[in-house]
A protein has these predicted regions:
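Switch/coupling sub-region of P-loop NTPases
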Residues: 177
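LRR N-terminal entry segment and analogous cap-like coil->beta motifs
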Residues: 64-68
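Flexible, glycine/small-residue-enriched loop-and-beta-strand segment within the central core
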Residues: 42, 69-78, 82-174
Length: 177
């Protein structure tokens, strides 16, 4: 499972969530803590670069948010990010520098590293996407098993029980879907 460890999947210099990710070995271990991390980090963001736009919603002044986009907190939209028409951020979302969240894309409990693109008709839930990861049109990170049992991550070497009912995907840096 060495390949699935945070240190091997993600360049932590490319996410504002590095202090959270550094505390854990595997990406799924981070998911239950995204919400509280955002709240703590948001209150510490520099006011000259970020503005608070509602309860637990911080948006970089250099970011672009379409008037038809819906942002629910807690969330952080980092610098130069673009939130396009009808994007829906349900909460517990970190949107990295230069990231694109497009038309009819929904986010829930996610970390999008810098320059991630989820540009149209995507669902990204309970997931972590690495630097420059890109999800093509209509791709989703299904986050609940059809039998509603806990998610097990499997490899040739071993199986690891995550203890989670909801776990979408862990896309490493520069992954294309």
């Amino acid at each position: 499972m060495e390949a699935m460890k945070i240190r091997n999947l993600y360049n932590l210099e490319e996410t504002i969530a590095a202090p959270l990710l550094e505390q854990y070995e595997y990406p799924w271990e981070v998911l239950p803590y995204i919400k509280e991390f955002i709240k703590a980090l948001g209150n510490a963001l520099p006011e000259d670069r970020f503005e608070k736009r509602g309860e637990d919603i911080w948006v970089a002044k250099s970011a672009t948010v379409a008037p038809t986009a819906c942002l629910n907190g807690p969330c952080i939209v980092d610098e130069e990010a673009e939130i396009r028409h009808c994007a829906f951020v349900r909460g517990s979302a970190i949107i990295g520098k230069g990231a694109v969240v497009g038309n009819s894309t929904e986010l829930k409990n996610v970390i999008l590293s810098n320059k991630v693109q989820v540009p149209h008709y995507n669902y990204v839930g309970d997931s972590i996407l690495g630097y420059k990861a890109h999800m093509g049109a209509g791709s989703i990170t299904s986050n609940v098993k059809s039998d509603k049992t806990l998610v097990v991550v499997k490899s040739a070497e071993e199986n690891i029980e995550t203890g989670l009912k909801k776990f979408g995907a862990m896309l490493g840096d520069c992954v294309e879907v």
